């Protein structure tokens, strides 16, 4: 199967691409960081095709879909944290729309994108009970609200065109090489292992973590 992974050189993509290649899929990684992708997948040169592309540019996205002959598209391209609003909109919202529209025009059979547990908002809204996908989305940060918007975009494309789009809401993805976004949970595990102290910004900080390899 031909799979296009957009943002494949990122924290999650670096793990996902080799798994897909090992399963026998024809994988294309589109990323703005071609050098990083080449380094990450150096041992998979005969199994992974790397193309430079900017998710905010529709021509880059649809070009990658067409060139790869993608049957499946996975979008992992995102900024973790806050950006100036105009920049955040282009990357997080317009970028996602570019992926969905390119998938629609090219007849991609299945699109997958990473949303986030952040869409639910703080646990305080729900008390001590478990939160699931049927609960109200109460995220308030730029990151969370943009993810909520992405979920609405996916719903709109499914409604309008009957597309198959899967949204995944990971928890706080953790791993020793995570450098951006919420890294307090990374520091909590890694710094003591290195003999270093760890500091949390708030005494009542709570995280729901999942290892990146999972």
Predicted regions and their residues:
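N-terminal Rossmann NAD(P)H-binding glycine-rich loop of SDR-like oxidoreductase domains
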Residues: 4-23
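Rossmann-fold cofactor-recognition segment
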Residues: 44-57
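Glycine-rich NAD(P)-binding loop of the Rossmann-fold in SDR/ketoreductase-type enzymes
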Residues: 56, 72, 87-98, 137, ...
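Conserved Rossmann-fold NAD(P)-dependent oxidoreductase catalytic core, especially the SDR/UDP-sugar
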Residues: 75, 98-142
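Conserved catalytic-site region of short-chain dehydrogenase/reductase
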Residues: 82, 114-128, 142-148, 173-177, ...
């Amino acid at each position: 199967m031909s799979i296009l992974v957009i943002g494949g050189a990122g924290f999650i993509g670096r793990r996902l691409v080799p798994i897909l290649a090992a399963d026998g899929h024809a994988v294309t990684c589109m990323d703005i960081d071609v050098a990083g992708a080449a380094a990450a997948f150096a041992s998979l040169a005969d199994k992974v095709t790397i193309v430079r592309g900017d998710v905010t540019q529709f021509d880059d996205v649809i070009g990658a879909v067409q060139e790869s002959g993608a049957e499946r598209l996975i979008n992992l391209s995102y900024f973790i944290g806050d950006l100036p609003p105009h920049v955040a909109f282009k990357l997080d919202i317009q970028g996602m729309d570019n992926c969905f529209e390119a998938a629609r025009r090219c007849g991609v059979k299945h699109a997958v994108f990473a949303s986030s547990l952040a869409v639910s908002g703080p646990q305080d809204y729900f008390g001590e009970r478990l939160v699931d996908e049927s609960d109200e989305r109460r995220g308030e940060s730029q990151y969370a609200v943009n993810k909520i918007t992405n979920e609405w975009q996916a719903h709109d494309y499914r409604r309008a065109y009957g597309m198959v789009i899967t949204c995944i809401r990971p928890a706080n993805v953790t791993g020793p090489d995570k450098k951006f976004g919420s890294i307090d949970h990374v520091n909590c595990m890694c710094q003591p292992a290195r003999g270093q102290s760890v500091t949390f910004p708030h005494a009542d900080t709570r995280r729901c973590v999942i290892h990146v390899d999972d």
